[in-house]
């Protein structure tokens, strides 16, 4: 899903905000699992929790903070997964 598609869903659907919140949680969990699998396969880690919490309710704030922090970088057609993965590597660096 792109940033534009997510914004449209959030505004047009009755439960759009709820749908996007759940979507972001899934993207966040998927990004962490994909990262962990890559590390197990020998890739250099880029997301390190180091004992800090990463909970489902944090997905939305990670996403929106990353969009605000780099507003000039992300275009509407960029995937939400990219934004959230970049947020995770920024907030949980190694």
Positions of the model-derived regions?
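Short N-proximal segments of mature Sec-exported proteins
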Residues: 1-65, 87
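Short, compact, well-ordered microdomains
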Residues: 64-94
């Amino acid at each position: 899903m792109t940033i534009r598609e997510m914004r449209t869903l959030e505004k047009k659907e009755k439960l759009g905000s709820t749908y996007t919140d759940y979507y972001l949680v899934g993207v966040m969990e998927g990004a962490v699992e994909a990262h962990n699998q890559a590390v197990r396969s020998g890739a250099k880690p880029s997301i390190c929790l180091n004992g800090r919490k990463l909970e489902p309710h944090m997905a939305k704030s990670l996403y929106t903070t990353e969009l605000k922090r780099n507003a000039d970088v992300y275009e509407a057609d960029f995937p939400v997964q990219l934004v959230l993965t970049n947020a995770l590597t920024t907030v949980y660096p190694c």
